[in-house]
């Protein structure tokens, strides 16, 4: 990394020293705030940390339906920058489309003599995000960036030609890094697929194919399951679970069910779920360690698990006592990909994404039950087999995190003048 020959004190705490020929300019002189309303026919936009500001229909996760008040939404033009309610976490977003967006957001038009792609990198850099966090007001869900404070802060501005050179350098380097990360992510997904295959096979075939076991098999009668060990029982969940509902424990720990992790302690400080939580939690259901919890609206996605915690969950969840099955085997089996199609099959609804699993449907789901000793043996086998896979996954994920941290540092160093991009490009060429 080549440094500039001459630096100066920027006079700005978050910047420190910058190249002598760079300018420092207050944000209020870099942007003009835009607050135009009354464009109800424009497409509704949403601000995302991953994709920038894009049409709402293109966003793959939640969609907030706006039925009225379109006149009150703010106009965003292509090339604007948008401060959303979550910008303090991931930077200010660039608008790739024209449309309208929440009136709670701040819309900024970039002034002349600034290259938008340079500002894009700057707005998403680690050092700038640290600055944003000093301008946050409110607590928890009410946190927001105070633009009155932020506009008084300053940004580093190299000459326009140098802004373009920095962007060219970063586009090349970031492209290489992103390509590497994508390849590593593919390897991680392959390992996760292998892990799921190992689990699904073990909880439906038992030890028949391992350690020279020669177990007779029989047809399960389920197309995607195929054969199961002949000595296993097939029981509907009505024989394995007992739905209960104990309330009036508002002071217990608030829990939630996440598809990938199972039952977790809900962290209200970082919760990005945006689900409404009432002040009075007396209607929430008590769940104890070892009980089975199902999010009835998302069961078809795999949002259910045996809990390792005591706490309370939403009234929209089913809470169940377990019987007959070893809880660790039941948890591993029921959360495997072998069983998710059953929950999809018994969930009903008019629109995809709003399917509801009824108590009757839940109790009709079949479960393939080995003898208790075999359940324990299968759990031990799965734990041993998946431990080695998890170790590989962890190694890949740690490598990806290191590369992502390098990417963030590279961007921050380039846009704040800590490295001479012009010299870097000359050496590369």
Regions found by a protein language model. Give the residues of each.
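Amphipathic alpha-helical coiled-coil/heptad-repeat segments
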Residues: 1-15, 21-23, 158-212, 369-429
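Non-catalytic DNA-recognition/assembly elements of restriction-modification systems
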Residues: 6-39, 152, 160, 164, ...
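A short glycine-rich beta-alpha junction/loop motif
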Residues: 8-10, 85-86, 99-106, 139-164, ...
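Sequence-specific dsDNA recognition surfaces
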Residues: 10-11, 28-78, 220, 238-289
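Short, ligand-facing micro-motifs at secondary-structure edges
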Residues: 40-62, 81-106, 117-121, 130-136, ...
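Ligand-binding loop in jelly-roll beta-barrel domains
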Residues: 110-115, 322-327
């Amino acid at each position: 990394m080549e440094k500039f020959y001459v630096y100066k004190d920027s006079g700005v705490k978050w910047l420190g020293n910058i190249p002598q020929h760079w300018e420092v300019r207050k944000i209020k002189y870099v942007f003009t705030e835009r607050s135009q309303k009354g464009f109800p026919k424009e497409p509704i936009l949403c601000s995302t940390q991953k994709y920038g500001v894009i049409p709402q229909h293109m966003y793959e996760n939640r969609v907030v339906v706006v039925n009225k008040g379109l006149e009150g939404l703010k106009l965003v033009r292509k090339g604007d920058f948008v401060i959303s309610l979550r910008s303090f976490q991931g930077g200010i977003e660039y608008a790739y489309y024209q449309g309208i967006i929440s009136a709670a957001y701040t819309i900024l038009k970039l002034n002349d003599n600034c290259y938008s792609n340079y500002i894009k990198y700057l707005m998403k850099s680690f050092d700038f995000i640290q600055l944003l966090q000093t301008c946050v007001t409110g607590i928890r869900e009410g946190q927001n960036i105070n633009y009155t404070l932020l506009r008084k802060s300053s940004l580093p501005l190299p000459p326009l030609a140098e802004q373009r050179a920095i962007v060219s350098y970063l586009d090349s380097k970031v492209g290489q890094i992103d390509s590497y990360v994508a390849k590593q992510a593919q390897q991680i997904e392959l390992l996760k697929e292998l892990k799921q295959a190992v689990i699904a096979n073990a909880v439906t075939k038992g030890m028949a194919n391992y350690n020279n076991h020669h177990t007779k098999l029989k047809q399960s009668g389920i197309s995607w399951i195929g054969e199961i060990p002949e000595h296993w029982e097939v029981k509907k969940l009505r024989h394995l679970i007992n739905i209960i509902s104990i309330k009036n424990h508002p002071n217990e720990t608030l829990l939630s069910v996440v598809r990938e992790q199972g039952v977790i302690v809900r962290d209200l400080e970082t919760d990005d779920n945006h689900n409404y939580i009432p002040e009075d939690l007396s209607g929430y259901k008590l769940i104890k360690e070892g009980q089975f919890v199902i999010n009835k609206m998302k069961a078809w996605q795999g949002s259910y698990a045996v809990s390792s915690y005591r706490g309370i969950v939403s009234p929209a969840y089913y809470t169940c006592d377990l019987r007959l099955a070893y809880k660790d085997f039941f948890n591993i089996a029921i959360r495997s990909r072998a069983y998710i199609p059953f929950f999809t099959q018994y969930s009903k609804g008019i629109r995809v994404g709003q399917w509801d699993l009824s108590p009757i449907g839940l109790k009709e789901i079949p479960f393939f039950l080995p003898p208790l000793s075999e359940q324990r043996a299968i759990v031990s086998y799965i734990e041993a087999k998946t431990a080695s896979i998890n170790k590989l996954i962890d190694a890949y994920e740690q490598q990806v995190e290191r590369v992502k941290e390098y990417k963030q540092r590279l961007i921050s160093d380039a846009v704040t003048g800590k490295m001479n991009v012009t010299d870097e490009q000359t050496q590369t060429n």
